[in-house]
From Swiss-Prot:
GO terms for molecular function: ribosome binding; rRNA binding; translation initiation factor activity. Residues 1-71 form the S1-like domain. It comes from the Eukaryota. The gene is infA. This is Translation initiation factor IF-1, chloroplastic. One of the essential components for the initiation of protein synthesis. Stabilizes the binding of IF-2 and IF-3 on the 30S subunit to which N-formylmethionyl-tRNA(fMet) subsequently binds. Helps modulate mRNA selection, yielding the 30S pre-initiation complex (PIC). Upon addition of the 50S ribosomal subunit IF-1, IF-2 and IF-3 are released leaving the mature 70S translation initiation complex. One of its GO terms (cellular component) is chloroplast.
Length: 77
């Protein structure tokens, strides 16, 4: 049976070494996020201030996997 995961949206507040980030979720929780393999392979750059979708396990709600970087409304890309 596959493990159930919660998907949240959050804001990157701090960049840490080795593809890790401090993420503030929309419900004001601070968690540690790491970059998923697809984002790492696609060379998608994640910077502080970016909005992301993060997948959090039910068993460890202090860590999550960043699965998508949302587009900023003011950027041209």
């Amino acid at each position: 049976m596959k493990e159930q995961k919660w998907i949240h949206e959050g804001l990157i507040t701090e960049s840490l070494p080795n593809g890790m980030f401090r993420v503030r979720l929309d419900n004001e929780d601070l968690i540690l996020g790491y970059v998923s393999g697809k984002i790492r392979r696609s060379f998608i750059r994640i910077l502080p201030g970016d909005k992301v979708k993060i997948e959090v396990s039910r068993y460890d709600s202090t860590r999550g996997r960043i699965i998508y970087r949302l587009r900023n409304k003011d950027s041209k890309d």
